[in-house]
């Protein structure tokens, strides 16, 4: 997914679950006190699935605002039903912000539908650039 988004000119500004590449989360501050950097890293990262939906939605809102994100790609692996519960809440928030979302449910590893994913994301990016 990261390769597809990057090849299409997108930039990933947040990954909201605790699997995958942590490189997309906030970095540990290396120029400050090491303990302070670690504390900030764990306090300000995306909350795990153990917090309320409202808090998770607000964290997504803050990330979108802070990064000036123009779209959201929701990519859920097979059997990742917990994350799908927050979709209606995230969708409502994004509608208010006029931010488009594209969602992919039940995705396999490795990705078995890369062409469809690439086409859908490419279409979204084209629409963001004013294309039809």
Short names for language-model regions:
Residues 88-132:
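Peripheral docking tails and interdomain loops at the edges
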Residues 20-24, 79-83, 109-112:
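Flexible loop/turn segments at secondary-structure boundaries
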Residues 13, 72-73, 102:
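Hydrophobic/aromatic beta-strand patches that form the interior of the parallel beta-sheet core
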Residues 70-78:
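Acidic beta-strand-to-loop metal/phosphate-binding motif
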Residues 1-52, 56-59:
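Redox- and metal-dependent alpha/beta enzyme cores, enriched for Fe-S-associated oxidoreductases
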Residues 51-68, 85-86:
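A short, acidic, amphipathic alpha-helical segment used as a generic capping/interface helix at domain edges
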